[in-house]
Design a protein with these regions (language model features):
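Lipolytic serine-hydrolase domain surface
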Residues: 9, 13, 17, 27-93, ...
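Short substrate-entry loop that stabilizes the transition state in hydrolases
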Residues: 2-8, 22
Length: 205
C-alpha cells in the first residue's frame, strides 16, 4: 500500500546493497541476494478506493506466494543427502522472509492457500527468520482459529515490529473500519504468543 512498482524495486535494491556493504571487504562473507515479490498497487495514500483496490490485489496475489513456498520446499528437498543432485553446490546461506505493511496481508492469505494446497499438513520450515514489519493485519491474527496461528511452523523465529505512530495503521484502522492493527500496538494477547514469536516496539525509534 502506498508504494508503486519503482519504489518497491528501489527499496529491494537498497536493502540488498546495505546488507552487502561489508562483504566486499571480507572474502569469507558471502553476498546476500534479495528477491522481491510485488503485486499491483495504486501507489496512493489517502484515497479509500486505492487502499481497497490494493488490498484486493494483495489478497488475490497470495495464491502465487503459496505456490512459491511449495516450489521452494520441493527444491530444498533435492538438497537432502538422499536426494541430492551432485551438480548442485550448496551455498550454505540461510533464507529469511521480510513482509512489510500490506505484505503481511499477502502472507496471511498465502497461509490459507498453503494449508489447502498442502492438504492441511504441517507447514514446511522454510525460513530461519520471518520479519513482520508494520503488519497491516488484525492484532488477534495469531490466536486459535485465525489464519496465522501456525505461522511459526514456517520459520525458526518470527518477529513483529510495530509502531503506534504509524499513519498507515490509522488509515487502515479508522478509515476502512478494520479491527486494531498488529502493526500499531502489537498483538492483542502477547502472553498467548508461541515461544518462537516475539515483538519489538519501534514507536520511539
Amino acid at each position: 500500500f502506498n508504494v508503486d512498482w519503482f519504489e518497491a524495486v528501489s527499496s529491494a535494491l537498497a536493502l540488498e546493497l546495505m546488507l552487502n556493504r561489508h562483504s566486499h571487504d571480507d572474502d569469507e562473507q558471502k553476498d546476500t541476494s534479495v528477491f522481491l515479490f510485488s503485486w499491483p498497487s495504486n501507489g496512493a495514500m489517502m484515497k479509500n478506493k486505492a487502499y481497497l483496490s490494493d488490498r484486493n490485489d494483495a489478497r488475490d496475489s497470495s495464491i502465487a506466494v503459496a505456490r512459491g513456498f511449495l516450489k521452494l520446499r520441493d527444491f530444498l528437498m533435492t538438497l537432502r543427502p538422499t536426494h541430492k543432485d551432485p551438480l548442485i553446490e550448496e551455498c550454505g546461506q540461510q533464507l529469511h522472509l521480510l513482509c512489510h505493511s500490506m505484505g503481511n496481508y499477502v502472507l496471511q492469505h498465502a497461509l490459507v492457500s498453503l494449508d489447502k494446497l498442502n492438504n492441511h499438513k504441517h507447514f514446511p520450515q522454510l525460513f530461519q527468520h520471518i520479519f513482520m514489519c508494520a503488519p497491516d493485519v488484525d492484532d488477534n491474527i495469531f490466536e486459535e482459529d485465525r489464519s496465522m496461528v501456525n505461522l511459526h511452523m514456517l520459520a525458526k523465529q518470527v518477529t513483529v515490529y510495530y509502531n503506534n505512530g504509524d499513519l498507515a495503521m490509522y488509515i487502515s484502522d479508522y478509515t476502512q473500519g478494520n479491527t486494531d492493527r498488529l502493526g500499531h500496538n502489537g498483538t492483542h494477547r502477547p502472553m498467548q504468543l508461541h515461544n518462537k514469536v516475539s515483538q519489538v516496539n519501534c514507536s520511539k525509534i
